[in-house]
């Protein structure tokens, strides 16, 4: 039982204090509930608690569901990558802390690889930062360089963490949509999606600090052309703006297309941070290693964020990754190089998925890069009007499909700001970096689905 004083006020007149005996049951609040009221969330994370991955990964956890939602590979990893990790685990000093900004052998390997690509010398100690995945690189960049009140331009649809990361920094996301110039009756590809240069320029202001670029793009699979990148570069230079370039799918580009690094364009190196990912490069998403590459005057601010948060990344993983890179750096012109063999393998899987989607009346957007394929589900005519939810149609459709067809995907409106969601809610995203048996299971679901429609 608790003893407390209750002060009573009536019509502005102060009454004498009286003692009241009460219990927590009378108040109807448990101790944890009272603590929850007392210790609320920090304002910087207000409204950021919803996450598409938490919700839909849980739905796909049922073993009977074929998971084409979350973007993790279930294909066989390169054996040499696994072998290098095994070796590293048995070296005593590789099980201890390493350099906080990147294991020496890894930053040297990255310097060698990207030095060849950029055709310039990259300082491994000053111009490269190894991070906790591409997420870590994005977080470091935004926290280290974006101030409250700044504006950050984001193209829609966008990888879902961009918006909340910008808001956590107290900044304002400014959105511009990619629009499709699709012609009915023709093959729909990610190249059909582009931005309007005049509309993009209108988004720049005196408050613009940065633009976030994603190429190859998730979820659409767009590979930005040199001409498109030049428009972005010219605007960044004109408005003295940073470019945060998320290029984690850089090696996954398909026939007829080429990945171009925006930092390689004239005048862009000094204002660009380029993000890479071990998970996407070597199909090891669970390693959670990424990197930022850019000029020392920008990287140093990202280092400050890292040293006051995670400080360093796992040593044996970095050491193993370095050795894997050296193996493929030495054979970059060889078809067996993983940078070359993986996109060829995935192009076959992409084409297979496109056929499967077409077979049930879904209209796919053929990606030029990445390992996701989007489909328009409106032609299926699945009536979900009786579902009691104010969620966008694609959210309800994916939940319905997961429950009734045992096939999971991700709603594309999850990659949109609130204003753009209605324009994308008939699209869903499927992942195709899956082993053949997984795609076989998906094919069987599609075949059964199609036969029941007939």
From Swiss-Prot:
GO terms for biological process: 2-oxoglutarate metabolic process; amino acid metabolic process; biosynthetic process; kynurenine metabolic process; L-kynurenine catabolic process. Its EC number is 2.6.1.7, 4.4.1.13, 2.6.1.63. The modification N6-succinyllysine is found at residue 116. Keywords: Acetylation, Aminotransferase, Lyase, Pyridoxal phosphate, Transferase. InterPro entries: Aminotransferase_I/II_large (IPR004839), Kynurenine-oxoglutarate_AT (IPR051326), PyrdxlP-dep_Trfase (IPR015424), PyrdxlP-dep_Trfase_major (IPR015421), PyrdxlP-dep_Trfase_small (IPR015422). Transmembrane segments: none annotated. Substrate binds at residues 71, 218, 429. Gene3D superfamilies: Aspartate Aminotransferase, domain 1, Type I PLP-dependent aspartate aminotransferase-like (Major domain). Its cofactor is pyridoxal 5'-phosphate. GO terms for molecular function: cysteine-S-conjugate beta-lyase activity; kynurenine-glyoxylate transaminase activity; kynurenine-oxoglutarate transaminase activity; protein homodimerization activity; pyridoxal phosphate binding. It holds the Pfam family Aminotran_1_2. The keyword Zinc does not apply. The modification N6-acetyllysine is found at residue 116. Pathway: Amino-acid degradation; L-kynurenine degradation; kynurenate from L-kynurenine: step 1/2. It catalyses: L-kynurenine + 2-oxoglutarate = kynurenate + L-glutamate + H2O; L-kynurenine + glyoxylate = kynurenate + glycine + H2O; 3-hydroxy-L-kynurenine + glyoxylate = xanthurenate + glycine + H2O; an S-substituted L-cysteine + H2O = a thiol + pyruvate + NH4(+). Catalyzes the irreversible transamination of the L-tryptophan metabolite L-kynurenine to form kynurenic acid (KA), an intermediate in the tryptophan catabolic pathway which is also a broad spectrum antagonist of the three ionotropic excitatory amino acid receptors among others. May catalyze the beta-elimination of S-conjugates and Se-conjugates of L-(seleno)cysteine, resulting in the cleavage of the C-S or C-Se bond. Belongs to the class-I pyridoxal-phosphate-dependent aminotransferase family. Homodimer. This is Kynurenine--oxoglutarate transaminase 3. It comes from Rattus norvegicus. The lineage of its organism: Eukaryota, Metazoa, Chordata, Craniata, Vertebrata. The gene is Kyat3.
């Amino acid at each position: 039982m608790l003893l407390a004083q209750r002060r009573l006020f009536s019509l502005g007149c102060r009454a004498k204090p009286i003692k009241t005996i009460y219990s927590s049951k009378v108040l109807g609040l448990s101790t944890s509930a009272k603590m929850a009221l007392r210790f609320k969330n920090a304002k910087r994370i207000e409204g950021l608690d919803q996450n598409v991955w938490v919700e839909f990964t849980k739905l796909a956890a049922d073993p009977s569901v074929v998971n084409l939602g979350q973007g993790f590979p279930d294909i066989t990893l390169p054996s040499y990558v696994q072998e290098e990790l095994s070796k590293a685990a048995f070296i005593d000093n590789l099980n201890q802390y390493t350099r906080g900004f990147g294991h020496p052998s890894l930053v040297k390997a990255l310097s060698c690889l990207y030095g060849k690509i950029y055709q310039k010398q990259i300082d491994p100690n000053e111009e490269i930062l190894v991070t906790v995945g591409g997420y870590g690189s994005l977080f470091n960049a935004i926290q280290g360089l974006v101030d409250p009140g700044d504006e950050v331009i984001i193209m829609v649809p966008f990888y879902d963490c961009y918006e909340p990361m910008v808001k956590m920094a107290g900044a304002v996301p400014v959105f511009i949509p990619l629009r499709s110039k699709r012609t009915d009756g023709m093959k729909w590809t990610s190249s059909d999606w582009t931005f309007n240069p005049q509309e993009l320029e209108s988004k720049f202001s005196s408050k613009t600090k940065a633009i976030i670029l994603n190429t190859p793009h998730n979820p659409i699979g767009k590979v930005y052309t040199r001409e498109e990148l030049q428009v972005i570069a010219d605007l960044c230079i004109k408005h003295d703006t940073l470019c945060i370039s998320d290029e984690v799918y850089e090696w996954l580009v398909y026939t007829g297309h080429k990945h171009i690094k925006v930092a390689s364009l004239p005048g862009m190196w000094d204002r660009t941070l380029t993000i890479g990912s071990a998970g996407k490069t070597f199909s090891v998403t669970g390693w959670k290693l990424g990197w930022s590459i850019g000029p020392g005057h920008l990287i140093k601010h990202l280092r400050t964020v890292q040293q006051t948060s995670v400080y360093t990344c796992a040593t044996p993983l970095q050491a193993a990754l370095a050795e894997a890179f050296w193996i493929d750096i030495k054979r970059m012109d060889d078809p067996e190089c993983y940078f070359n063999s993986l996109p060829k393998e995935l192009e076959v899987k992409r084409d297979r998925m496109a056929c499967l989607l077409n077979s049930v009346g879904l209209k796919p957007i053929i990606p030029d890069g990445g390992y996701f394929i989007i489909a328009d589900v409106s032609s299926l005519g699945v009536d979900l009007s009786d579902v009691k939810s104010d969620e966008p149609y694609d959210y309800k459709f994916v939940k319905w499909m997961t429950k009734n067809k045992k096939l999971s995907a991700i709603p594309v409106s999850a990659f949109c700001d609130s204003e753009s969601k209605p324009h994308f809610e008939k699209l869903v995203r499927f992942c195709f970096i899956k082993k053949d048996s997984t795609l076989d299971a998906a094919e069987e679901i599609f075949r059964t689905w199609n036969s029941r429609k007939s």
